Amino acid sequence: MSTPSAPETPPLPYTPAYPIRTERLDLRPVTPDDFAAIHAYQRRPEVCRYLYWGPLDEAASRASVAAKAARTTLRESGDLLQLAVVVRDSGTLVGDVTFVWKSSAHRQGGIGYVFHPDHAGRGYATEASRALLELGFEELRLHRIQAELDGRNTASARLLERLGMRREGHLRENEFLDGEWADEVVYAMLAREWRAQREERARQR
């Protein structure tokens, strides 16, 4: 009996067709003109409380924007897409999202997100993150997509659960952040779980 082969992923390099459009949002490459909007939340301590960086001063934020602007194409494992999230009707940049190509061999990806708190409660982070899952599972045909977060970041955990991701791991005191030990929590979704969720959404329409 032959062993079934894993579905092929798209050949690298891979560049999405920009903008990635959702019901209300455009996910597009970051540009230098986005500095003011991105720095407006990167400098805020409450935004960076559970992240691996920040708050950022203007120089650090300009460097961050420049790095994000260069991350528009996936070429090899470890590469990132870092995209501005813009409300289509108003043109307002409300945050940015990250898609990580973790492993070609194992068809693994990852997602991340940072949003301005002034725009919280409107579902933008959930909508943009779901677009990244769709990119990973539908376009790139990945098998598994995960997200890691500080164990104290309950708002982020709720977002991932709304997406249908499962809590897979809790690493105790795994990171030393801002002068204290912090737990790390891992959420993930498999391709078959995404397909089941997609079919359920279709039935509810």
Role assignments for model-derived ranges:
Residues M1-D118, L135, E139, E180-R205:
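GNAT-family acyltransferases
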Residues G91, G123, N153, G179:
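Conserved G/P- and acidic residue-centered "switch" motifs that form tight phosphate/ATP-binding loops
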Residues Y113-F115, G121-E138, T154-R162:
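Conserved acetyl-CoA-binding loop-helix of GNAT-fold acetyltransferases
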Residues E138, R144-A147:
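Short, basic (Lys/Arg/His-rich) helix/loop patches that form interaction surfaces
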Residues Q146-E148, R166-E184:
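Conserved catalytic-core motifs of GNAT/GCN5-like acyltransferases
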